[in-house]
Structures are given as structure tokens and as C-alpha cells.
């Protein structure tokens, strides 16, 4: 009888630990499942993905990995959601400050984010960025 009680206790603990693991949200799955190909990269409404453009190095594929790391065009770094999963913060050693992006659209096929950042060429100017991606 003692063995049964001990086994029951151990099984209950294992079930409790397994069930208490945080499940991944739908938005987390939508963001981390595909590889995202850039569709448009705009700064103040103008294409900024060409040679010399402010977003040139973001051009290409973006992959948000489940472990919080990722690639964003030519950049590598970390990413995280805010608590409401309405913003993504991208942190990379290649940029002087983290970029906080507001999620405008996130579906199985489309990702659209916006951000406001200082223009590195003129710190008095704010650039309004809009980055759109399509799932590969």
C-alpha cells in the first residue's frame, strides 16, 4: 500500500509539472513557424531597402526562432514580445539601440510591423518605418 501511495504521489507530481508548462500562444506560433521574406521596407513612406537605404540590411529573410534568437536580413540577434504580444523588440550588436516594432498585422501569410527610430544621419529627425513580410 505504501508503494502505491508513493507511486501515486510521484505520478501526480509529474502530471502537475507537465500540465503547468506554459503553452505557446497563437501569436508566438504564427511568428516563429515560417521564414519571413521581406515584401516592402519603407522609411517615411519611401522604399529604403535599396543600396545605401536605411533598411538595406533588413532586406532578405527574417526568422524568429522559438528560443528568442533570430536573423533579420543580414542581422543576427535576439527578439522578444512585450507582455501583450503586440510589440516585438529586436536586439542586435549591429545596431546601437534595440528596435521596438508595433505589430500591425500577423497572420499565417503576412507580417507587418511599424517603428519610429532616430535617423542616424540626423538625430533630430524621426523616421517612421514600415516593414512588411510574406511567409515563405
Per-segment meaning from a language model:
Residues 1-29:
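Bacterial Sec-dependent N-terminal signal peptides
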